[in-house]
Design a protein with these regions (language model features):
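Alpha-helical transmembrane segments of multi-pass inner-membrane proteins
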Residues: 1-161, 243-276, 281-289, 300-311
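Generic alpha-helical secondary structure signal
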Residues: 2, 189, 210, 214-217, ...
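Extracytoplasmic catalytic-loop and juxtamembrane helix elements of membrane-embedded
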Residues: 88-99, 164-182
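Short aromatic-rich membrane-water interface segments that cap or initiate transmembrane helices
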Residues: 97-106, 179, 183, 233-241
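TM-adjacent membrane-interface loops and short helices in multi-pass inner/ER membrane proteins
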Residues: 181-231, 238, 245-252
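Phosphate/oxyanion-binding loops and surfaces in catalytic or ligand/nucleic-acid-binding neighborhoods
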Residues: 197, 201, 222, 288-292, ...
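Short, charged juxtamembrane terminal tails flanking transmembrane helices
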Residues: 315-318
């Protein structure tokens, strides 16, 4: 969420001092996410990098800022990889999806190319008259089409690897594409068991759930020693609510978050500062697919959501 706020505000702010501060916060967040060695953080990154262009590609300043953001991310990866190799006997080694990225031999050239593209965009904006005009809406629509194709491609890869039985063709990506009990640090196991437990619910529980915060009680009493490790939550916020407060509660929760994001998104044209709150929530609801609501993050999420909604309802700001 902090990354969503920092990156979004950096992307749209006109104040140089605020831009520098947000940029530094964003860099620290990039380092923290990668060094945390948690793959679920990459879902938030995908949401951030995927949806920001829908706002930024409406102006050439936004295009330059976006190029700077992704170039910085690539540079951060290279820096951490260098530290990993130079101090291999001192630091704790990193793995997960980060390892796949660093093993890509062309990563350094991609990062360098992004910096070249950013510098070229800056030079064009300063010296070229043709670069001072408005940006065609086709760029935003083109990016939206790219996002749609990316989703379809991801769906095809999942189908090809799981239903088609072609898991061995994907090499290091196999553990991300093939769903089994060990997927996602045994998330696959508890997700499968969650649906099996739901299948045995009484009709009333199938509508309204087993009871708030009773997932651990349910798994311990029903699964017991069968579990390879003790699961007191589903490691999926939406599945957790599906089991504990039922489809009715889950639909209400998703509808509330979705309507809040939609309301903030529609207000970005007139109140661009809301973008920080909006992207914080977008990043949160994306990573919630493999995480649950915890006391250290939930209050921050609800606070940012409340600030964003209050700003939408505020008519005049001096």
């Amino acid at each position: 969420m902090v990354l969503g706020v920092a990156a979004a505000w950096f992307a749209i702010t006109k104040s140089k001092v605020r831009a520098i501060w947000c940029y530094l916060c964003m860099v620290v967040c990039f380092f923290a996410i990668i060094m945390g060695s948690s793959d679920n953080a990459y879902l938030a990154l995908a949401a951030l990098f995927g949806f920001l262009p829908l706002i930024l590609f409406k102006s050439k300043t936004g295009i330059r800022r976006y190029l700077l953001i992704i170039a910085t991310f690539g540079t951060v990866i290279q820096c951490i990889d260098f530290i990993n190799q130079a101090y291999a006997d001192t630091v704790i080694g990193l793995d997960s999806l980060f390892e796949i990225l660093t093993n890509f031999n062309g990563l350094i050239y991609v990062a360098a190319g992004l910096w070249v593209a950013y510098i070229a965009a800056c030079l064009l904006s300063k010296y070229s008259r043709n670069w001072t005009g408005s940006v065609s809406p086709a760029l935003v629509y083109g990016w939206a089409g790219f996002l749609l194709l990316s989703v379809l491609l991801a769906g095809f890869l999942l189908f090809h690897a799981n239903v088609g039985g072609n898991a061995e063709k994907y090499g290091a990506l196999e553990k991300y594409l093939v769903f089994n009990d060990s997927w996602g640090t045994n998330r696959g196991y508890i997700w499968r068991k969650s649906f099996e437990l739901y299948r045995d619910f009484k009709p009333m529980h199938k509508l309204f759930g087993h009871g708030a915060d009773t997932f651990g009680i349910l798994t311990v009493s029903k699964l017991g020693a069968e579990m390879p490790e003790r699961f007191e939550n589903a490691h999926n916020e939406y599945l957790q609510y599906f089991i504990t407060i039922g489809p009715m509660g889950l639909i209400s929760y998703v509808a509330f978050l979705g309507s809040a994001v939609t309301r903030m998104w529609k207000s970005l044209e007139t109140k661009p500062y809301i973008i920080g709150c909006c992207f914080a929530i977008i990043c949160y609801i994306t990573q919630a697919v493999v995480n649950i609501s915890v006391p250290i993050t939930s209050p921050v999420m609800w606070m940012l959501l409340s600030i964003g909604m209050a700003a939408c309802n505020q008519r005049n700001i001096d």
